[in-house]
A protein has these predicted regions:
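Short, low-complexity N-terminal intrinsically disordered segments enriched in polar/charged residues
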Residues: 4, 20-53
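A short gly/proline-enriched turn/hairpin at secondary-structure junctions
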Residues: 68-77, 93
Length: 148
């Protein structure tokens, strides 16, 4: 009788743990993964991956708390950190059909300003990105977008 109780308890434990793992889904841990942002170049590369390749891992740690994004157009818009992070998380896995080029405009031990150009078939998006060293990691603190 004790063996039967132990068998049912083991089966119940296996069933519960299987359902718990299935509820998380295969990509649940990937979005919470830490990314290496120890250099400005790594942070810039990750920013480009997030904006153009739908990379969602490490999005929360990529942007500074006071991050601000401005979009220059006839109807200028501004977005804060939480709005941008939420938007990028929704775009998980979506790849942009564009050619990407990056140019470092200015760089020091504490900050970097880069120009990221996305050339699409009918228009070009230019993104001026400011990155800052905050502690041991680099974070994106500002982004200004324009379209041609």
């Amino acid at each position: 009788m004790k063996a039967l109780v132990k068998t049912f308890a083991a089966a119940a434990l296996i069933t519960v743990s299987t359902f718990a793992m299935a509820a998380e889904g295969p990509g649940a841990k990937a979005t919470k993964a830490n990314v290496n942002l120890s250099t400005a170049d790594l942070a810039l590369d990750h920013y480009v991956a997030v904006t153009t390749e739908g990379e969602s891992a490490g999005v929360d740690q990529l942007f500074a708390e006071d991050f601000n994004q401005k979009i220059q157009s006839s109807n200028a818009q501004s977005y804060n950190r939480s709005e941008v992070v939420k938007s990028f998380k929704k775009q998980k896995g979506e790849k942009m059909n564009c050619t990407v080029s990056t140019d470092i405009i200015e760089e020091s031990a504490e900050y970097m300003v880069a120009k990221v150009t996305l050339k699409f078939e009918n228009f070009t998006k230019t993104d001026l990105v400011t990155l800052e060293r905050l502690g041991k990691n680099w974070k994106v603190s500002k982004s200004i977008n324009s379209y041609k």
